[in-house]
Amino acid sequence: ASGQLHRPQPQEHTSTSAAAGTWRLTQASESRHRLPHCSAAPSHQDHSAMGFGPELWCPKGHTELLRLQDSELRLLELMKKWMSQRAKSDREYAGMLHHMFSQLEKQEGLGHLRATDHSSQIGESWWVLASQTETLSQTLRRHAEELAAGPLAKLSILIRDKQQLRKVFSEQWQQLSQEYAWTTQQEVEKLKAQYRSLVRDSTQAKRKYQEASKDKEREKAKEKYVRSLSKLYALHNQYVLAVQAAALHHHHHYQRALPTLHESLYSLQQEMVLVLKEILGEYCSITSLVQEDVLAIHQKVAHAVEMIDPATEYSSFVQCHRYDSEVPPAVTFDESLLEEAENLEPGELQLNELTIESVQHSLTSIEEELLASRKAVSSKEQRVWELQVELRGEELALSPGERVHLLGKRQGLREAQQQLQGLVCAQAKLQAQRDMLANKLAELGSEEPPPALPLQEDRQSARSTDQERSGVTALKTIKNHISGIFSPRFSLPPPVPLIPEVQKPLCQQAWYHGAIPRSEVQELLKYSGDFLVRESQGKQEYVLSVLWDGQPRHFIIQAADNLYRLEDDGLPTIPLLIDHLLQSQRPITRKSGIVLTRAVLKDKWVLNHEDVLLGERIGRGNFGEVFSGRLRADNTPVAVKSCRETLPPELKAKFLQEARILKQCNHPNIVRLIGVCTQKQPIYIVMELVQGGDFLSFLRSKGPRLKMKKLIKMMENAAAGMEYLESKHCIHRDLAARNCLVTEKNTLKISDFGMSRQEEDGVYASTGGMKQIPVKWTAPEALNYGWYSSESDVWSFGILLWEAFSLGAVPYANLSNQQTREAIEQGVRLEPPEQCPEDVYRLMQRCWEYDPHRRPSFGAVHQDLIAIRKRHR
């Protein structure tokens, strides 16, 4: 507890967790945990042909497959522990028998054991009994050695390969899902959004061109119109190619990639079942004795091993998890994009004088990529063939009971086949895009590309332009009328009355966001014309923020003589001013030309200051004071964090960072966000009130009276909360006892997310200084390079464990921050606290591995703590 240090010595690590599991789902468990089937399959299905097919392609099925493998791994660990104990018992028993014979030999001498004056049946019987006991001890010792060198060693290999299989399967499934989502959803949606924007720009440019009266203005408008069409056509082609690629990726994903992945997993799982059967058979053979009573037990064990059939091992699992999951529809061209566009056909490339060059360049580029893709496919096919030949040759030379040594090679073959499927998919997409481009150019032949559009000649009269526009309008009207006949009619709710909404005060307007940071405004405004009203954090003024031409613009609403204005005449209230700008569609200012189109509404977390009744001050944070309080609506007890009004805007934005993280969290071991008050100063973050206070004070005051099992349970709570954050790619960066809260029932909750960050790849690179970093809780890679990740949080969790079992002592108490960093770099770690269980301290040491990749995940830490708690009765 004094925070002294020691250098870790090399030691043999042994597994600290072993839990019973089962591979085969019993009928009773099916009745308790029956899940919906993926499809209506016949009940008398041929189980031998069943695999991890379409029933398990959905995320639920993937989760169940991972859970199945985890269950099997737990069972294998249990078997390994069992066999190890059996070998140890046999060695000890053989040693005891040998000791008995040695003692007898010392007392009587080997000659006296048999030599008698006459032939004595008793002496001969005694010699046989004693000598056969020694023979039995040698046999048992040999059996123990064979058990350790045979089944036990092979079981370790099987566990290692099964862990690797689970890891590879999970990674490949995630990779396939991410690639599928990127190709069929994200990229297509991004192009669709750009498509709509360019269609609007093109329509606007066309209108200006048609309305231009002077020659100079008309020529200028014409150039702008042509440029907009050029961009639109180029993007149209890009979108067509993306849709083609997405459709092919969809087909390949559900017809090739997923079936190959699941067939590979199913095959390897079956192979591992067969390997385990051989291992158990060898175990049964080695441990078999000849006594009748033992033989009866052995026959039962042998029968149980014989019942293992790899072909039907997973039949009950597949039957139990047949989810109702349909393959999503293939990606097709969104014809709604063409409602306002001209001369464009769905799914057809646009080849004209504006796009001929880009189409030719695209064809050249894709042909180069296709050539490289073909080489990669050919190389991978050769590698798959070589692995198959090697595997067949080794199978022929394989001795009975040695299949386990081929598991790694089988898994390598399956991985290569899966990689081949990915390369084939990429080649198919490139080939389809290349064919589409080549066919389009072949249709053109040696002719000149057609003009991009029939531009009106400058000499045409305005009257003819009006006639053409009216003709187009009439044609669109006819189209809309015809499509309306066949499209379903939807009943729409009546429009919301505008007058009562306008008369509401500013704080009740859905588009008023209060004192939110300027940086957050940029995230909320997504499309041109989006707007909101906020309160300036520095000057106590109201600001109208609008997105225009891809940039957020901010206009201070001027207040004078009880009127609010931006440029023209004022109105009595800001809601009336905003409503006037929306209804009239007049520019905000003549210079900017900005027009409001869509209000951005505040989210569900926004509370008014009047909704919260403040109580007494219960603490102080980095940004301001913390109060107890109640919600006026239902008297819910809450904790209210306030932000000092004098702080600069960048610190106020950091204050709200905690709320942005907590909005996405919903877990019993994470403190719950209730809302945010940003309508005026000071800003509040409203959270659930955790009555027990911070964990550090709890340890120092109540820790000595706390039972060991309860303390482990509280650490289990912390690990569960951090495991949830890890799944959300959230990095806490300040995990310590002082930042955890304890409920009245001694449940621990993770709190204080002021330094937290959320990154898609789970890694955050800090570029700030070291002033506020808690050095003694922070991982070395974060201190040295600013690299924060869930692995660095695991290091901090190890310090939290040490704090808990030292009952609130200060880590590295006798060292400064700099001395602590130097000691850690030299391999020095904290000594185990008094009364700390050995398996808990081993877990701490694993958390303090210098290499982040060697530290356990929070999921593993959580499971280890559960196992440790179960062992401490």
Swiss-Prot record:
Segments forming domain Protein kinase: 612-865
Residue numbers spanned by region Disordered: 1-46, 445-471
Taxonomic source organism: Fujinami sarcoma virus (FSV)
Keyword Nucleotide-binding part of the UniProt annotation: yes
This protein's name: Tyrosine-protein kinase transforming protein Fps
Catalytic activity: L-tyrosyl-[protein] + ATP = O-phospho-L-tyrosyl-[protein] + ADP + H(+)
EC primary class: transferase
EC number from the UniProt entry: 2.7.10.2
Gene3D superfamilies named among the record's database cross-references: Arfaptin homology (AH) domain/BAR domain (1.20.1270.60), HR1 repeat (1.10.287.160), Phosphorylase Kinase, domain 1 (3.30.200.20), SH2 domain (3.30.505.10), Transferase(Phosphotransferase) domain 1 (1.10.510.10)
Domain SH2: from-to ranges: 511-600
This protein's encoding gene: V-FPS
GO MF term list: ATP binding; non-membrane spanning protein tyrosine kinase activity
Entry-annotated residues carrying Phosphotyrosine: Y764
Other noteworthy facts: This protein is synthesized as a Gag-Fps polyprotein.
Biased composition annotated in UniProt, kind: Polar residues: 11-29
